[in-house]
């Protein structure tokens, strides 16, 4: 930073935002093709493109922060504010799904049989797989906090152990959710109940996959000695995001699975 008289990071031009946006367009278009035409080609291309962009964008950020020293305290403060605002926007994103659910369930229309769950819908038992998933996510919240405390106390071995456990629990949750979707007696096409259930829980599941990927990158960085006791915002951001995913699941469980059944 000796060549400039301020502590801000002047970011170099990057191709990844436009490539990432293109990959997102391919992925969402691929989802439509999969839903309507049962074709996975475009979705596969979109996901592969997204994966490649993610790897290279993360590589650039790691290079700028860890090896070039661009992430000064001023930059880290800005990143913290950015992550807080991002998580706030995500909370409002999920608020829309909860609004749709309660709008439909608190005053069911005659088309739904004037009852909730609607006529013909056999809801999932909230005391079976959903309760197990709740326990898994709560346990993962404990392990990610354990990892954070281990990093701040310079206990690298425990940090790696705790973070590995968190990632395993995250992927276990995803596997159970996929199994639950496969065994559900209703689909996304089964009226407003199917739509709100699968869109809300599906987007939450997507956030779990994103969070698990985020934590996996943090684990690789931890193994490569990228984090210190006072410079590990990449991990902090991932932990904040993971706790947010936990809280959203608790609201989903209590409203859609438990109250809504």
UniProtKB/Swiss-Prot annotation:
Keywords, ordered alphabetically: Membrane, Mitochondrion, Mitochondrion inner membrane, Translocase, Transmembrane, Transmembrane helix
InterPro entries: Cyt_c/ubiquinol_Oxase_su3, Cyt_c_oxase_su3_dom, Cyt_c_oxidase-like_su3, Cyt_c_oxidase_su3-like_sf, Cyt_c_oxidase_su3_a-hlx
Protein name according to UniProt: Cytochrome c oxidase subunit 3
Quaternary context: Component of the cytochrome c oxidase (complex IV, CIV), a multisubunit enzyme composed of 14 subunits. The complex is composed of a catalytic core of 3 subunits MT-CO1, MT-CO2 and MT-CO3, encoded in the mitochondrial DNA, and 11 supernumerary subunits COX4I, COX5A, COX5B, COX6A, COX6B, COX6C, COX7A, COX7B, COX7C, COX8 and NDUFA4, which are encoded in the nuclear genome.
Side Mitochondrial intermembrane, residues: 35-40, 106-128, 184-190, 257-261
Gene3D superfamilies, per database record: 1.10.287.70, Cytochrome c oxidase, subunit III, four-helix bundle
Source taxon at top rank: Eukaryota
Stretches in topological domain Mitochondrial matrix: 1-15, 67-72, 153-155, 224-232
Keyword Aminoacyl-tRNA synthetase: no
Function: Component of the cytochrome c oxidase, the last enzyme in the mitochondrial electron transport chain which drives oxidative phosphorylation. The respiratory chain contains 3 multisubunit complexes succinate dehydrogenase (complex II, CII), ubiquinol-cytochrome c oxidoreductase (cytochrome b-c1 complex, complex III, CIII) and cytochrome c oxidase (complex IV, CIV), that cooperate to transfer electrons derived from NADH and succinate to molecular oxygen, creating an electrochemical gradient over the inner membrane that drives transmembrane transport and the ATP synthase.
GO terms assigned for molecular function: cytochrome-c oxidase activity
GO-annotated cellular components: mitochondrial inner membrane; respiratory chain complex IV
Any single biological process term in GO: mitochondrial electron transport, cytochrome c to oxygen
Membrane topology (UniProt): Multi-pass membrane protein
EC number, as in UniProt: 7.1.1.9
Family the entry assigns: Belongs to the cytochrome c oxidase subunit 3 family.
Localization of this protein: Mitochondrion inner membrane
Organism from which the protein derives: Struthio camelus (Common ostrich)
Catalytic activity from the UniProt record: 4 Fe(II)-[cytochrome c] + O2 + 8 H(+)(in) = 4 Fe(III)-[cytochrome c] + 2 H2O + 4 H(+)(out)
Pfam families: COX3 (PF00510)
Segments crossing the lipid bilayer: 16-34, 41-66, 73-105, 129-152, 156-183, 191-223, 233-256
SUPFAM superfamilies: Cytochrome c oxidase subunit III-like
């Amino acid at each position: 930073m000796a060549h400039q008289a301020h502590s801000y990071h002047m970011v170099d031009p990057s191709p990844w935002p436009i490539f990432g946006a293109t990959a997102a367009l391919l992925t969402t278009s691929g989802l439509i093709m999969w839903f309507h035409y049962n074709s996975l080609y475009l979705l596969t291309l979109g996901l592969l493109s997204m994966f490649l962009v993610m790897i290279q964008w993360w590589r650039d950020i790691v290079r700028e922060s860890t090896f070039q020293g661009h992430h000064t305290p001023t930059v880290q403060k800005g990143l913290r504010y950015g992550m807080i605002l991002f998580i706030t926007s995500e909370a409002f994103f999920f608020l829309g799904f909860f609004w749709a659910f309660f709008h439909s369930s608190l005053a069911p229309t005659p088309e739904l049989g004037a009852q909730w769950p609607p006529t013909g819908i056999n809801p999932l038992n909230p005391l079976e797989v959903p309760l197990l998933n709740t326990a898994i996510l709560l346990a993962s919240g404990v392990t990610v906090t354990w990892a954070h405390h281990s990093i701040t106390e310079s206990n690298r071995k425990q940090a790696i152990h705790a973070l590995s456990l968190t990632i395993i629990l995250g992927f276990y949750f995803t596997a159970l959710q996929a199994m639950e979707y496969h065994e559900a007696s209703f689909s996304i096409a089964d009226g407003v109940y199917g739509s709100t259930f699968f869109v809300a829980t599906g987007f939450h599941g997507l956030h779990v996959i994103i969070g698990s990927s985020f934590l996996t990158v943090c684990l690789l960085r931890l193994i490569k000695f990228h984090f210190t006791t006072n410079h590990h915002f990449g991990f902090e951001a991932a932990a904040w995001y993971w706790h947010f995913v936990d809280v959203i699941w608790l609201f989903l469980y209590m409203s859609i699975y438990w109250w809504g059944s």
